[in-house]
Amino acid sequence: CITFLYTLNGKQLVTVENLRNGDLHPVQKAMVESDGSQCGFCTPGIVMSMYCMYENKVKPTNENIDKYLSGNLCRCTGYIPIKNSIKNMYNYKKNNSNQNNIITLLKKIKRNDIMIENNESRFFVHYNLKGLIKDYQKNKNSYLLVGGTDLALEVTKKRNNLKNIFYIGSNK
């Protein structure tokens, strides 16, 4: 929710709505079968955390479940049905019919350096260190951005206008 849009250049954004490929994704099926959702407010975040576990084939130990659910708050279920759904999600088969096409399309994306500006600020994305160093030296008093959980709050919560931001999370 605090990710700068520019940092998504050349990436696939997967949302809970995107998981369904003809049929529910295994994590969605597991949530339904285990009654893991009640009011639905927390469900998208929890399902996406489960999706990360599933896609990375993380063993559903109690420690891993707690780690992947951190940052998600559910006030209805008491977490037992959610944890049960995580333990059961590997019992469901995934429909992979679209995955190879997505991977092919992502590999075709040209990763060119970009600079986006408005009247007050500029945002740079560099994919090589040489270009980053060159532009950064020209723009002193700039901010370096990797993940953004600290810097993004300066914009979203404090409403500070950051003049020059260099995103280095895509740097090779």
Model-predicted regions and their roles:
Residues 39, 143-144:
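A residue-level structural signature of the nucleotidyltransferase/glycosyltransferase Rossmann-like core
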Residues 106, 147-149:
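A broad, low-specificity signal for short, low-complexity segments enriched in glycine/proline
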Residues 2, 146, 153-172:
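Structural signature of FAD isoalloxazine-binding scaffolds in flavoprotein oxidoreductases
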